[in-house]
Amino acid sequence: MLRTRLIQAASSAQRAFSTSQKALAAKQMTVRDALNSALDDELARDDRVFILGEEVAQYDGAYKVSRGLWKKYGDKRVIDTPITEMGFAGIAVGAAMAGLRPVCEFMTWNFSMQAIDHIINSAAKTFYMSAGAVNVPIVFRGPNGAASGVAAQHSQCFAAWYAHCPGLKVLSPYDAEDARGLLKSAIRDPDPVVFLENELVYGTAFPVADNVADKDFLVPIGKAKVMRPGKDITLVAHSKAVETSLLAAAELAKKGIEAEVINLRSIRPLDTATIFASVRKTHHLVTVENGWPQHGVGAEICARIMEDQTFFELDAPVWRCAGVDVPMPYAKTLEAHALPRVQDLVEATLKVLGGKVGKAAAANK
């Protein structure tokens, strides 16, 4: 029943979206269309690529990410599966070992717990255990993290979970450019990739450059992007927390504080070079994520800073702005308070800057 509710909720919550061809002709692109067009490109480019998962074919996907692809490519390239994540993830990993390039969709990453043995013990470790003889070129993708009103068992962020495991690459796109370019790179990659999308931005349209529509447009794995330059403090985020960071940076600008916002894009490998370069410039850092704080992505960034000479560039301790350390509440008001808000991030920034707030504002006038 819960899966049925998720499908119905996804269907009713959809904003207007177009086919791949229309999306690629636009100056703006939704994340849903970006993912759809990336899948279309790679299915057309390489006949080893195929998609499998629950409702991905005739229903066009629970969130319509695979819309039109079953009609275009048929039953052998876009495959509906039974409700058994362990079963179809195992099929996908075996197919990858045999030389195909599966894209395995989870209706939500929370359901990947049913398939975690195949992801961690089979996909991630086979290249190492075979001494490099067997690649596992597979993409596991689907919505990750907090959605809206789906409570504790369907709102977890798995970025830190999977980034802990050697042998996996873990990507967390934010906007349409990220989604299209990173998914194409993931499908072409020789290693298993965990691709963590966010349901809440599927229908959001982002401005895109003309080259994003190119068939070979790729976003490199392991490279972060500076979304907003600044000189007073660095805000490092991934997925929807990038939006929170950009909004907070706009509020901070009203106070005369210039925050630099970094979109990680890639959780493993982690682009420490971009983070370190920014911290050497701003001398202050706040990490932002919707996942839990303990052993999270922000905690790893803090550790990397501590282990590098960049630590000596800090003028104040690093601050983590993360989800509250509790299972996600169902009540809407409590749910809103369980995730970092713009005001939370503004307050964290002011605490890190401390007495330098007035000086920064004066210097930036």
Curated annotation (Swiss-Prot):
**Which reaction(s) are listed as its catalytic activity?**
N(6)-[(R)-lipoyl]-L-lysyl-[protein] + pyruvate + H(+) = N(6)-[(R)-S(8)-acetyldihydrolipoyl]-L-lysyl-[protein] + CO2
Effect of gene knockout: RNAi-mediated knockdown in neurons reduces life span of adult flies and results in locomotor defects at both larval and adult stages accompanied by abnormal morphology of motor neuron terminals at neuromuscular junctions and mitochondrial fragmentation in brains. RNAi-mediated knockdown in eye disks induces morphologically aberrant rough eye phenotype in adults and aberrant photoreceptor axon targeting.
Q: Which GO terms describe its cellular component?
A: mitochondrial matrix; mitochondrion; pyruvate dehydrogenase complex
GO annotations under biological process? pyruvate decarboxylation to acetyl-CoA
Q: Name one GO molecular function term.
A: metal ion binding
Binding, thiamine diphosphate: E85
Expressed in which tissues: Expressed in salivary glands (at protein level).
Which InterPro entries does UniProt cross-reference here? PDHB_mito-type, THDP-binding, Transketo_C/PFOR_II, Transketolase-like_Pyr-bd, Transketolase_C
Q: Where is the transit peptide?
A: 1-24
Binding residues for K(+) = I138, A186, I187, D189
Question: Which keywords fit this entry according to its UniProt record?
Answer: Metal-binding, Mitochondrion, Oxidoreductase, Potassium, Pyruvate, Thiamine pyrophosphate, Transit peptide
> What does this chain do?
The pyruvate dehydrogenase complex catalyzes the overall conversion of pyruvate to acetyl-CoA and CO(2). Might play a role in regulating synapse structure formation at neuromuscular junctions. Might play a role in maintenance of mitochondrial morphology.
Q: What is this protein called?
A: Pyruvate dehydrogenase E1 component subunit beta, mitochondrial
The organism encoding this protein is Drosophila melanogaster (Fruit fly)
